[in-house]
Regions:
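C-terminal active-site/capping subdomain that shapes the small-molecule cofactor and substrate pocket
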Residues: 109-201
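Glutamate identity and glutamate-enriched acidic tracts
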Residues: 46, 54, 62, 80, ...
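Conserved anion/nucleotide-ligand pocket segment
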Residues: 2, 6-80
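C-terminal and late-domain segments of enzyme folds
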Residues: 61-149
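Context-gated lysine
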Residues: 3-6, 13, 53, 57, ...
Length: 201
């Protein structure tokens, strides 16, 4: 389980950040901005409302790239000079209505510190992306209840931001989209009476 549907830039981040991490590319900065004109955009135009969403978006990269494990690539500690710069913005723009556009500028570096950039421009319809997730969540929640599973359902984090986990059991948040997909497939197999056939790396 988690908070808020993962349909736009957080989906992009949870899918692209693992590429950076598995190739051991360094990250200097990631700048994300959105424009949208629906009610969501209007609500998030208020700074106090935006703050919660900003925190969930910012935490995605940290849990995937793990700066404490690879400080030379992703920074470490509280020293801003050694950390990658991460900025997220959402702008209300009424002419777009339900059409959402997200821009991501990603500054990376490779072998011998050579700088490179990745640009992603994601034009989408918020409700078209969210509606199937709602249906999947209803069906899978019902399946979990029928299978006698209660409490936090970590496998549903595939659809959601800010994945929930049990600190008391030593669990860590999983934001990596591919690991979340493995968790989803394994949970469905287990609820169907089969063994999980994939490990989460």
């Amino acid at each position: 389980s988690g908070k808020d549907f993962k349909t736009g830039q957080t989906l992009v981040k949870s899918g692209f950040a693992p590429i950076i991490g598995t190739r051991c590319l360094g990250l200097s900065g990631w700048f994300s901005t959105n424009i949208l004109g629906n009610r969501d955009g209007l609500v998030l135009d208020e700074p106090a409302n935006f703050h919660t969403k900003e925190v969930s978006k910012l935490s995605t990269l940290e849990t995937i790239l793990k700066p404490d494990v690879q400080p030379d690539l992703y920074g470490h500690g509280n020293d801003e000079d050694t950390q990658y710069y991460h900025k997220v913005r959402i702008n209300y723009y009424p002419p777009r209505n339900d059409n959402k556009e997200g821009w991501d500028n990603i500054d990376i570096f490779g072998w011998m510190g050579y700088p490179m950039q990745v640009k992603i421009n994601f034009l989408c319809r918020d409700s078209i992306l969210a509606a199937p997730l709602l249906l999947d969540l209803c069906l899978l929640s019902d399946l979990a209840a029928r299978a006698g599973r209660y409490g936090t359902q970590r496998f549903l984090s595939f659809f959601l931001k800010s994945p929930m986990h049990d600190y008391t059991k030593g669990e860590e948040a999983v934001n990596n989209l591919y690991q979340q997909y493995t968790m989803l497939k394994n949970a469905i197999r287990e609820m169907g009476g089969y063994e999980a056939d994939e490990e989460i790396d």
